[in-house]
Amino acid sequence: MKKLVLFSIITAITVAFGSTQSEIDDLQKQIDRLKKKVSKNNAQSSKDNIKWSVDLRTSIDNINYDMANGTTKGNDSLMSMRLWLNMAYAADSKNIFKGQLSYNKAFGADFGTTSSIMPRGYGMDTFDWVTNEALTDNSIGLRYAYWLYMGDDLFGKGIDWTFSVGRRPSVNGFLANLSQDDRASSPLAHIINVEFDGASAKIDLSNITGINGMSFKVCAGQGSTNAEPLFSTASSYAEDTDALDGISLVGFIFAPYNDGQFIVETSYFQAFSLPDMDIDMETGEQLGFKEYGDIEGAALSVLIDGLTEDGILSETKLFGSFAWSNTMPDDGLAMLGSMDAESGSSYWFGAYVPFGENAKYGTIGAEFNHGSEYWRPFTYAEDTMIGSKLAVRGDAFEINYTYQLTKALSLQARYVSIDYDYTGSNGFFGDTSGASMSIDDVKAGANAWSAMGGTQDPASVKAVVGNLMASGMSQSQAEASAKEMGIASAYLPNIVESSQDFRFYLRYRF
């Protein structure tokens, strides 16, 4: 009897397990069918692997320019809209793609201006270094796109490293991101804040050295390419030996320490074959771009993110930065108006103070920077309507207030003021747009031109020469002085002595 009961129990268990296994097999088949269906659907929708996010900013700027001749220019209500469409895709844990499409336009149509018959989006505002930061037309452009490989065992030593190629995320870098309320991109914004194409490789040294956040990154970029357009000649895309050489840039970023609270970054670069507009100084005729030489630069930037363990100072940010540049002109040519190698420097510091826990009532920021006579960074893409404040040969200050209205919506009020001591802060690298001349000296020369009888009529130079000779100068001295005074008088109406930009924006990010 006991054997019969035991046999019955074993039979029942076997049947039950058999039934359960059958159900499991059926479920697995259903899962496999669903996987095939999902794969088919994903294939039809490009696998739906690119993740999109939106950053839409609508702003109004009140801008003003005080010209060196005493006149003013400006725009009381420059309204614009900027759209960033962000893309991200990870093929696996080591390979990442990131990109950003950009649209940046003033409200309304553009019929050209008296200074240019070309509307916005067809002149220098399409220059590759700033094309997505300038107000252009209704077109959507590519701000950055790159792939990134992330390794974790360099040389078999367990060292983290990365390598990346593409159009770089090189705008709004370290420290400049604070006023922009953005994450910092890679470059130190004190010396590099432009769009460019290139590559980078980074090694994490923290595990080797035991120093928090230590890393070393090498970067290389192409600022311009010398190649004939398609079908413009029989040799499409061949190098034009009579044109400017391609502009290139190499450098490194070394972070000696970063524990999340104390962040120190340094950078050095060299840029080669840099241009400026060649101008006939007698007639003012523009003769096209010309190569003038090379430049090098370096920066040391420090951020303290939190001064105490708790309270308002725990979320306060303080920063300071020092940067240096040095020109290397080609033989017989002048860079920044000088035929000698000239060094320039700049210092920059600021503070950001949140009000309320987690900036419940917003954050106030204040910044100040100063640049010397021959200071020359690559900061053309800095986000103001009045040019780069960090490029100033003089003084600039900024105050801003940022408030998070909702999870997705924020506002900012920002005021930037720039006072120039020298010309050429937002120019290129030669002896025309980039030339550094004391604005006070130019004003004195223009005043002397008028005092000696000079007018806008070129023929008045004879009266100026005669009056100078009557004051005791030789004819050659008088002619040379009259030429300098006449150039100063002609330049004066186009020299900005100070500028201001007040901006208010609403920004949606999700």
Predicted regions and their residues:
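N-terminal periplasmic/intermembrane-space "pro-region" immediately following the signal or transit peptide
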Residues: L4-T72, N86, A90, K94, ...
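Outer-membrane beta-barrel strand-turn architecture
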Residues: S46, Y89-S93, G151-K157, L205-G210, ...
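Membrane-embedded beta-strand positions of outer-membrane beta-barrel proteins
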Residues: V54, G99, F163-V165, F216-V218, ...
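Transmembrane beta-strands of outer-membrane beta-barrel pores
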Residues: T58-N64, S93, Y103-F107, R167-V171, ...
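Surface-exposed loop and membrane-interface regions of Gram-negative outer-membrane beta-barrel proteins
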Residues: S59-R82, A88-D160, S170-L188, L274, ...
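Residues on the lipid-exposed face of transmembrane beta-strands in outer-membrane beta-barrel proteins
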Residues: L83-Y89, Y144-Y149, A199-I203, F252-P256, ...
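Signature for the C-terminal beta-barrel architecture of outer-membrane proteins
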Residues: D153-T162, N177, D182-F355, I364, ...
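Outer-membrane beta-barrel "beta-signal"
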Residues: L409, S436-S471, S489-F510
